[in-house]
């Protein structure tokens, strides 16, 4: 595989050789250093067999040696320079993780609050000495490859798990007969195979093993995308250490986390959904097939709150004065890309008033939990873990425990727009899909540099502050979208990341269903709202397809190669590093329209009970498009399939660019007979066009035009249609602003308003464009392009001025796209 890819334009490489070894559990022990903008410490990885290792014969294991030939050169395992520990500063509350863990002969590499001495020499692998291995009698050593980027790796060592007392009752390892190497491998092999009902004991064993001493440094090398590890004389994965410890620290420029300030000006750091995921936060196996559990202990100054995607609601443990330790864990195996962390001066927001009674009323669409979930047996098809789908109490829990965190300055906005919505949105999701896959939920309002409206991880959702403006409409729909990801994107993941529609298409389709249910809309009103939103998305999809290359319009770009990996397990994500991809919505929109087409074709009474059944059968697993489509059609009598087949759906919707024929026909029919809400908007547009044609000086006493009250979605559609007008006078724009109170509307409405302001150079509202670029960065990227193509010096200066103010904290992809627009 070519690993010298252009990091700004090419496909994203997934380098880990998961076919040979799979990480089963991570234990992270980290310190957050805001002064130097680094996270440092160590991570212990526990391995099981790879995807194809169990089926291999001795002859096929020769491929391991062939795949290792690319790594002739390794650095000599050099001891880290470590400062002596002042015993007077040791705190017994820290546990014996603070004791000697750097390997034989080394002293503790941490000072009293867990940080590496900042004066020590940084033994980065990129500046290390190299040598060739000659100690394996001509055989190549097996090479463990981890995904890694922008990390300073100080040392890698094998962990002596055999030195941990008390593991005998959990393992079958024959201590008397086994060699030390064999014994260590057997202990870990037994540990990762413990049954789900022993998860507490398993986590405790993992913790104690992670604190065991090292028993020999391993040789390491790296390139731009990976960390490569080997042990001299070990030629197959079966003989490679099953538990290794990596000492490392992140770099301030690493793209996995963003170091910035919150809305109160306080420092914070969080995972912001980088294209490279978490490989600049910790060495890991990125391919989604590498599903693992994890534990993490994170230390930070006492003024900070540490939130993570763990299943427990962690409480801080005091360390020495001024520092706290936070511990999280998960027992459901998931890809490393789902790991999330946010450290900042967040305040928990608690509702001051109960939500309206009508939003808390229980009801069902289309089946109640008792009717639906009991139709399926309690067996699960995923790897063993403590699963909520097997719990009767979890199945009936429509509202899981939740918390909301934000900078204190946003408390009022959270009270008005968010807190009262959460119970109804959670209940609505449960009424549609059944059991919540995760036991709790934290919601964090992230800093202004967050590049999207929301991001879901297990047990935690990041929301942009842009969702808190205007009415509750944008906040509610976005919250429903992110909640939908609990099922599609997290509990059920795509086996091939290029099939992004399996996550985003489903969440976009379900957000409308959840939101209508949360609002308690009668069926006819829910249908009208959904038709209006389909109209808006149709306009957006047309714009996307006009302005994107054909290769990025395909939902299944790898076609028959989808899901395939190399012999080692490595692969690439097509267009994964293209900075423009993060701002495209083709996978959201085409995926949404496919699911809408299937729902309308088959009927809601068939589709949604099927979807609930699909979730029950496939949670905890990775899927491809055909898994969903095949099960859908298998659950429909042949005489009701209306000519649908997996082959024609894949051909017409997933593997073609442009607009599918079925969608063109549907929208053509909609244009001929628009929905009531769209017709109402059309009438209002006609009024505004007449107003715009009036002479500037009107006679006194002329009757004012009466405009209808419109919903936020209707205002967006109105502004989109008005954008098609060649000219709008300043008087018309002023009247438009006053009529709909546009500066106070939600971010979707204000975005369209800013487009009108720029197009017609309405100078009185330039300050609103500037405010949008500074405060609504999740949606403002497109406006920079509009400002520059306006060819108006004042507008172009506004663009440059705003970019100068925000570029330091803007994520790299956003900054790159804006730079190309401006320069």
From Swiss-Prot:
Disulfide pattern: none
E.C. numbers: 3.4.11.-
Cofactor: Zn(2+)
GO biological process, one term: proteolysis
UniProt xrefs under InterPro entries: Aminopeptidase_N-like_N_sf, AOPep, ARM-type_fold, M1_LTA-4_hydro/amino_C_sf, Peptidase_M1_C, Peptidase_M1_dom, Peptidase_M4/M1_CTD_sf
GO CC, alphabetical: cytoplasm; nucleolus
Residues involved in Zn(2+) binding: 481, 485, 504
Sequence motif Nucleolar localization signal, residues: 693-703
Compartment annotation: Nucleus, Nucleolus
Keyword flag Cell division: no
Keywords carried by this UniProt record: Aminopeptidase, Cytoplasm, Hydrolase, Metal-binding, Metalloprotease, Nucleus, Protease, Zinc
Entry-linked Pfam families: Leuk-A4-hydro_C, Peptidase_M1
Coiled-coil annotated spans: none
Tissue: Expressed in testis, heart, brain, lung, liver, skeletal muscle, kidney and ovary. Expressed in vascular tissues.
Similarity field: Belongs to the peptidase M1 family.
Reported function: Aminopeptidase which catalyzes the hydrolysis of amino acid residues from the N-terminus of peptide or protein substrates.
The protein's name in its UniProt record: Aminopeptidase O
Source organism (scientific name): Mus musculus (Mouse)
């Amino acid at each position: 595989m070519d690993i010298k890819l252009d990091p700004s334009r090419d496909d994203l490489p997934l380098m880990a050789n998961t076919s040979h070894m799979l990480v089963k559990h991570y234990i992270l022990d980290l310190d957050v250093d805001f002064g130097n903008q680094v996270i440092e410490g160590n991570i212990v990885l526990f391995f099981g067999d790879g995807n194809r290792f169990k089926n291999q014969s001795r002859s096929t294991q020769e491929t391991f040696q062939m795949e290792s030939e690319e790594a002739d050169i390794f650095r000599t395992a050099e001891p880290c320079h470590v400062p002596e520990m002042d015993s007077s500063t040791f705190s017994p509350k820290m546990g014996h993780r603070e004791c000697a863990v750097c390997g034989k002969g080394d002293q503790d590499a941490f000072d009293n609050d867990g940080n590496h001495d900042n004066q020590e020499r940084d033994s980065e692998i990129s500046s290390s000495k190299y040598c060739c291995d000659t100690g394996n009698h001509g055989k190549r050593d097996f090479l463990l490859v981890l995904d890694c980027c922008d990390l300073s790796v100080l040392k890698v060592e094998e962990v002596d798990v055999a030195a941990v007392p008390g593991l005998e009752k959990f393992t079958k390892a024959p201590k008397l007969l086994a060699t030390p190497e064999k014994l260590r491998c057997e202990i870990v092999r037994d540990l990762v195979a413990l049954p789900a009902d022993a998860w507490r004991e398993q986590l405790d064993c993992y913790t104690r093993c992670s604190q065991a001493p090292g028993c020999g440094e391993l040789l390491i090398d790296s390139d731009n995308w990976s960390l490569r590890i080997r042990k001299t004389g070990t030629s197959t994965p079966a003989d490679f250490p099953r538990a290794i410890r990596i000492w490392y620290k992140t770099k301030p420029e690493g793209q996995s986390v963003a170091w910035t300030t919150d809305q109160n000006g306080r420092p914070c750091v969080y995972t912001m959904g980088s294209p490279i995921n978490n490989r600049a936060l910790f060495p890991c196996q990125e391919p989604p097939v590498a599903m693992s559990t994890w534990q993490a202990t994170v230390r930070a100054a006492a003024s900070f709150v540490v939130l993570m995607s763990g299943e427990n609601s962690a409480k801080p443990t005091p360390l020495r004065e001024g520092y706290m330790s936070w511990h999280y864990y998960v027992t459901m195996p998931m890809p490393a890309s789902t790991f999330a962390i946010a450290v900042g001066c967040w305040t928990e927001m608690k509702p001051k008033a109960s939500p309206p009674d009508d939003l808390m009323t229980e009801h069902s669409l289309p089946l109640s939990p008792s009717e639906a979930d009991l139709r399926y047996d309690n067996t699960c098809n995923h790897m063993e873990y403590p699963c909520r789908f097997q719990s009767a109490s979890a199945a009936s829990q429509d509202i899981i425990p939740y918390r909301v965190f934000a900078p204190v300055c946003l408390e009022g906005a959270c009270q008005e727009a968010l807190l009262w919505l959460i119970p109804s949105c959670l209940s609505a999701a449960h009424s549609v899909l059944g059991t919540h896959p995760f036991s709790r939920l934290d919601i964090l309002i992230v800093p202004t540099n967050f590049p999207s409206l929301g991001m879901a991880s297990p047990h935690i959702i990041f929301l942009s502050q842009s969702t808190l403006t205007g009415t509750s409409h944008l906040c509610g729909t976005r919250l429903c979208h992110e909640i939908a990801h609990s099922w599609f994107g997290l509990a059920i993941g795509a086996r091939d990341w290029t099939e992004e529609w399996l996550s985003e298409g489903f969440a976009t389709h379900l957000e409308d269903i959840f939101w209508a249910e949360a609002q308690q809309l009668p069926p006819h009103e829910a249908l009208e709202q959904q038709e209006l939103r389909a109209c808006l998305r149709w306009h957006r999809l047309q714009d996307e397809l006009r302005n994107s290359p054909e290769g990025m319009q395909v939902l299944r770009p790898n076609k028959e190669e989808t899901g395939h990996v190399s012999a080692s397990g490595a692969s690439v994500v097509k267009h994964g590093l293209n900075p423009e991809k993060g701002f495209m919505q083709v996978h959201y929109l085409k995926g949404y329209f496919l699911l809408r087409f299937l729902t309308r074709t088959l009927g809601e009474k068939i589709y949604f009970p099927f979807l609930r059944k699909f979730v029950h059968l496939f949670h905890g697993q990775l899927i491809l498009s055909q898994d969903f489509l095949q099960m859908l059609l298998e659950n429909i009598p042949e005489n009701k399939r209306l000519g649908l087949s997996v082959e024609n759906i894949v051909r017409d919707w997933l593997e073609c660019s442009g607009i599918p024929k079925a969608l063109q026909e549907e929208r053509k029919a909609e244009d001929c007979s628009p929905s009531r809400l769209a017709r109402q908007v059309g009438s209002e547009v006609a009024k505004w066009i007449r107003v715009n044609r009036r002479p500037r000086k009107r006679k006194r006493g002329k009757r004012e035009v009466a405009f209808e009250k419109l919903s936020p979605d209707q205002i967006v559609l109105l502004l989109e249609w008005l954008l098609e007008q060649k000219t709008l006078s300043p008087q018309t724009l002023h009247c438009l602003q006053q009529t709909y109170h546009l500066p106070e509307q939600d971010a979707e409405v204000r975005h369209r308003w800013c487009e009108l302001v720029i197009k017609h150079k309405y100078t009185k509202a330039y300050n609103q464009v500037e405010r949008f670029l500074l405060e609504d960065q999740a949606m403002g990227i497109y406006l920079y392009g509009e400002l520059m193509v306006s060819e108006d010096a004042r507008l172009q200066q506004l663009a440059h001025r705003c970019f100068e103010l925000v570029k330091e904290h803007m994520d790299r992809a956003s900054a790159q796209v804006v730079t190309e627009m401006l320069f």
